[in-house]
Amino acid sequence: MKTLLLTLVVVTIVCLDFGHTRICYNQQSSQPPTTKTCSEGQCYKKTWRDHRGTIIERGCACPNVKPGIQISCCTSDKCNG
């Protein structure tokens, strides 16, 4: 009985993956809000201007960006809203 209980606890911890996933918004500025569970543990919000105006892109991880693009990376759920 103890072995079964211990097995269930271990499986629960592995499945929940404490601290290694993050819920991030993952849409562009013109789209309705959507979220994604990210394995990388970080969210980003990228902002730039072009002929359409200000563009905002959201997603997982923290990508490298070209000059002229602002990026904000964060590590809590839905922090890139």
UniProtKB/Swiss-Prot annotation:
Keyword Ion transport annotated: no
Gene Ontology, cellular component aspect: extracellular region
Subcellular location: Secreted
Keyword list, A-Z: Acetylcholine receptor inhibiting toxin, Disulfide bond, Neurotoxin, Postsynaptic neurotoxin, Secreted, Signal, Toxin
A Pfam family this chain is assigned to: Toxin_cobra-type
GO MF terms, alphabetically ordered: acetylcholine receptor inhibitor activity; toxin activity
Disulfide cross-links: 24-43, 38-60, 62-73, 74-79
Tissue distribution: Expressed by the venom gland.
Domain of life: Eukaryota
Signal peptide stretch: 1-21
InterPro entries in alphabetical order: Snake_3FTx, Snake_toxin-like_sf, Snake_toxin_con_site, Toxin_cobra-type
Biological role stated in the UniProt entry: Binds and inhibits fetal (alpha-1-beta-1-gamma-delta/CHRNA1-CHRNB1-CHRNG-CHRND, IC(50)=1.4 nM), adult (alpha-1-beta-1-delta-epsilon/CHRNA1-CHRNB1-CHRND-CHRNE, IC(50)=12 nM) and neuronal alpha-7/CHRNA7 (IC(50)=400 nM) nicotinic acetylcholine receptors (nAChR) thereby impairing neuromuscular and neuronal transmissions.
Family: Belongs to the three-finger toxin family. Short-chain subfamily. Type I alpha-neurotoxin sub-subfamily.
The protein, known as: Three-finger toxin A1
